[in-house]
Amino acid sequence: MKVTLPEFERAGVLVVGDVMLDRYWYGPTSRISPEAPVPVVKVENIEERPGGAANVAMNIASLGATSRLVGLTGIDDAARALSQALANVNVKCDFVSVPTHPTITKLRVLSRNQQLIRLDFEEGFSGVDPQPMHERIQQALGSIGALVLSDYAKGALTSVQTMIKLAREAGVPVLIDPKGTDFERYRGATLLTPNLSEFEAVVGKCQDEAEIVERGMKLIAEFELSALLVTRSEQGMTLLQPGRPPLHMPTQAQEVYDVTGAGDTVIGVLAATLASGNTLEEACYFANAAAGVVVGKLGTSTVSPVELENAVRGRAETGFGVMSEEELKQAVAAARKRGEKVVMTNGVFDILHAGHVSYLANARKLGDRLIVAVNSDASTKRLKGETRPVNPLEQRMIVLGALEAVDWVVSFEEDTPQRLIAGILPDLLVKGGDYKPEQIAGSEEVWANGGEVLVLNFEDGCSTTNIIKKIQKDSDK
């Protein structure tokens, strides 16, 4: 299937549903409580993240699309924290405040990347007048390409049929992440995205793929749906549409750390891709790739365009490509468990030339994995002058990540990558040029950890500076 890269900046999506605040308490455990046979967690870090429908909206915004969110909250600190967190990531919120109810909050306590307990603070919003939400939907319909209804059965979507009717009359597709077994509520929707458990709770246990397809097609006909996407965890996802053969996509996940919010990512990417003008098949392709990325992260998470770019070309976030420092540490840890030798180098790599490619290929031959650390734009200006870099950081990193010799690409803001190298501690640190090993940033830390430091020669006659001078000279003719 040929997939067109979505123009997410063109897309506008409205998310309506159950919003909540996810709180995370992190800390080590080293003893058992004397009061009860439970571990004692010394809380050292607290995080607050938007959850539920708010996480869907964040996933849409993280792709660069215009994301609007309508939901019910209380008038409390949790609502204010939720609004601020969403504003920080460019989600446009239009909440209906309900003074008699608290904002739904879920508190998770974690230690060593394991969730120990979850505490829920909620009363549900059933019985709240839905008219203010209908008015907000009506106002937004002229500026969106998709409507997402994110149902967590907390009371925000008690009038789903009215919402579907409003959108369909305006020609806007309606995507629903369902909850419960009453799918009659979702009659006439464009697409439902149940997971396998939710699907089987409605149609019964399916013994094989054929039964999933047969019962799914009956569900589509019964509830007048345009399509059905069944997400199947480690088995990927299956798209069913009337008059078309089923489309099954295997999972792209490399490592699974946490499935929290994965369904939010799927429907968010689906909606943003459809609103960009892509087909439903293409939207599912991107959503499947995004799901493979997000389950490799801890807690509710989003996927950036760079991560999605890596994933769709088969370079999953936990395995290969452009990544953040924290993601790189996870990938390196996984490589070490496999007994792989990690090589690391760094540079500006402004205009990639034959000398760079040859150098990186030679560096890769010295181990099993190659990390390339790249100076940020600000760092490059300080080192090379105000006219550099010619190519911005994101473009430099994407080009490097596309090289067969390069496994991981990461950026750093400082003048040297010493701090980054000290955090990664590669088995072998290499640098090109006329350096002495002791002059290379990070060499002391690598040696102290038992690693090696090596200087490689650049190919003669290749220089970014000379290329720039030649371009300038030719343009002056």
Curated annotation (Swiss-Prot):
Q: Which domain of life is it from?
A: Bacteria
Residues given in the record as ATP binding sites: 195-198
- MF-aspect GO terms: ATP binding; heptose 7-phosphate kinase activity; heptose-1-phosphate adenylyltransferase activity; phosphotransferase activity, alcohol group as acceptor
GO cellular component assignments: cytosol
Q: What is its EC number?
A: 2.7.1.167, 2.7.7.70
Q: Which reaction does it catalyse?
A: D-glycero-beta-D-manno-heptose 7-phosphate + ATP = D-glycero-beta-D-manno-heptose 1,7-bisphosphate + ADP + H(+); D-glycero-beta-D-manno-heptose 1-phosphate + ATP + H(+) = ADP-D-glycero-beta-D-manno-heptose + diphosphate
Which EC class, in a word? transferase
Q: Which UniProt keywords are listed?
A: ATP-binding, Carbohydrate metabolism, Kinase, Multifunctional enzyme, Nucleotide-binding, Nucleotidyltransferase, Transferase
Q: One of this protein's GO BP terms?
A: ADP-L-glycero-beta-D-manno-heptose biosynthetic process
Alphabetized CDD domains for the sequence: RfaE_like
- Please give the residue ranges the record annotates as the region Cytidylyltransferase: 344-477
- Pathway terms, separated by semicolons: Nucleotide-sugar biosynthesis; ADP-L-glycero-beta-D-manno-heptose biosynthesis; ADP-L-glycero-beta-D-manno-heptose from D-glycero-beta-D-manno-heptose 7-phosphate: step 1/4; Nucleotide-sugar biosynthesis; ADP-L-glycero-beta-D-manno-heptose biosynthesis; ADP-L-glycero-beta-D-manno-heptose from D-glycero-beta-D-manno-heptose 7-phosphate: step 3/4
| Residues forming the catalytic site | 264
Pfam families, per the entry: CTP_transf_like, PfkB
Enumerate the residue ranges of region (Ribokinase).
1-318
The residues forming a coiled coil are: none
Q: Which InterPro entries match?
A: Bifunc_HldE, Carboh/pur_kinase_PfkB_CS, Cyt_trans-like, PfkB_dom, RfaE_dom_I, RfaE_dom_II, Ribokinase-like, Rossmann-like_a/b/a_fold
- Subunit details for this protein? Homodimer.
| Family statement drawn from the similarity comment of this UniProt entry | In the N-terminal section; belongs to the carbohydrate kinase PfkB family. In the C-terminal section; belongs to the cytidylyltransferase family.
The protein's job, in short, is: Catalyzes the ADP transfer from ATP to D-glycero-beta-D-manno-heptose 1-phosphate, yielding ADP-D-glycero-beta-D-manno-heptose.
- What protein does this entry describe? Bifunctional protein HldE
